[in-house]
């Protein structure tokens, strides 16, 4: 009897070991299958991956915002407005249909996370992670039997020129390697990933600390937040991440208008905005250059010498970085000069000192590309400035005047001609904007008929371009502009879109997503010839 029990026990133990090994083997196989399947989809249809990513975080944010209670528990937010806000934060658009002070501290933290993981720097860091996964089983790119084309928002070769506006060209790593005369080691990509992560941490934590210190040292700014019941830590972290991510949200209803006389605070935020978008590439190159001087690492030297070989679009040559910086600075100066020339004695800058006016003009000019924070009521600005801002919001972040040398059109522009032909038949950005404006004019036609001063074509165009550029500027809605006075009308601090119908808001959600993914259509519409 005992012998039978011993034999049964041994058989059971053997079966357990066998089952455990098979289960472990199955788990590893499943993980590899999922990994390689995802890599295959990512390489062949990265647009699908990006759409899925932003849809996932947007709906996750929507669910979190719905579960958490707003500040005023009796004020129930509409489902569409909550989804709109979640998409707006995820796509760093800062378009608003509800007042920010309606959200509780817990909900503000959710929006902070959405702005962080939806920002350009963070998503580009994810791109580097997938690039590392692609090289995980190889010693280096040069030893690969084939070099797949990776068409991803951050892993692209970007050509700059007077007519390209940062045209994205999909190229294989082998072609990049031949063009640049080197090869990429996996450890170099890993190092770059750590550099971008460090950049993200330094800008966000450093920005939060600077804002926190200012609010503690300046009683007038501290009193504003105390009066509104907003914690300093929440405001500091939220505003810093929003600024670096170029989202444009702030925890207060008035955005930065309430701090328009706190010029030092505005000047502290300006570098964060530039470092997170239009000057990210030059700042990243400066960081790599500094690390090379301090550590002498070969990886830094390689990245500086062959930025295109990495395949990370935010890595630029010295020449490209200089021209991009000059373009950004020139556009800021142009906007600031025009703003001060036209608005110096206007209502928008009323009550400010000369110094505060200059800082406010500079702040507005920087935010037009593409952060969206504001220190003035845009509805009080002249039409010329609003047209200027519309143009600035339309321009891509890396728009640069870069004179092209003879022979600069290299092999990369000849690759994937078949795909380029398909892209030519896709509508251009201007075509999409025209379609979206027409659709919203249709959904809001009743309001345009009864309230033409608020619901006019330019206001709708301004709102659509702002959403498509992921900026967040809005001319707002004013009860004073009603033709027939309505005692029930109440002015609100949120954007003009907050007064739109549900259909109009739904279309604007699509516009924000289109705008966040517009880098996949930088060459669209070339088949259309106007003669």
Swiss-Prot record:
It comes from the Eukaryota. Weakly expressed. In roots, expressed in epidermis, exodermis, cortex, and sieve elements and companion cells of phloem. In mature leaves, expressed in large highly vacuolated cells of the adaxial epidermis, phloem and xylem. Keywords: Endoplasmic reticulum, Golgi apparatus, Ion transport, Membrane, Transmembrane, Transmembrane helix, Transport. Residues 1-46, 129-190, 285-321, 404-421, 515-530 are cytoplasmic. The chain crosses the membrane at residues 47-67, 108-128, 191-211, 264-284, 322-342, 383-403, 422-442, 494-514. Interacts with CNIH1. Functions as a highly-selective sodium transporter. Does not seem to function as sodium-potassium cotransporter. May be involved in turgor changes for rolling and unrolling of leaves in response to environmental variations. This is Cation transporter HKT1;3. The lineage of its organism: Eukaryota, Viridiplantae, Streptophyta, Embryophyta, Tracheophyta. The gene is HKT1;3.
